[in-house]
Amino acid sequence: MQAHPLRGSLFEKLVVLEMLKARINAGLAANLHFYRDSSGLEVDVLLEAGNMIRLFEIKSSQTINQESFIQLNKVAAIFGERVVKKVVLYAGQEQQKRSNASVLSYLYAGEAATNEVTPGSAHETD
């Protein structure tokens, strides 16, 4: 499956379904959106909660590099201060706090989608 041409797409769907399942089971609105603008700029999941937005990029690789953050940061620039959290969910096991986003294992996708983000909380982007 590592080299299968549909690996990335299937992995992304698995992660989004886990996020959706966690939100529904927690009694939260299932407000997960895919974002793409007219120029092709996209992010895998945009989660709106009131006026706040969390952005998620999903990667099927087991390592993260700087390219993993490019789309995330460009979309965050469009929404400005409304973005309170940027997360890369990937197939690896390590959790990291980078200067521009959090990096979480896909195993935490449900938790990342259900933790409510409020200004000043531990989940707010620095």
Regions found by a protein language model. Give the residues of each.
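A cross-kingdom feature that marks ATP-driven nucleic-acid transaction machinery
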Residues: M1-D126
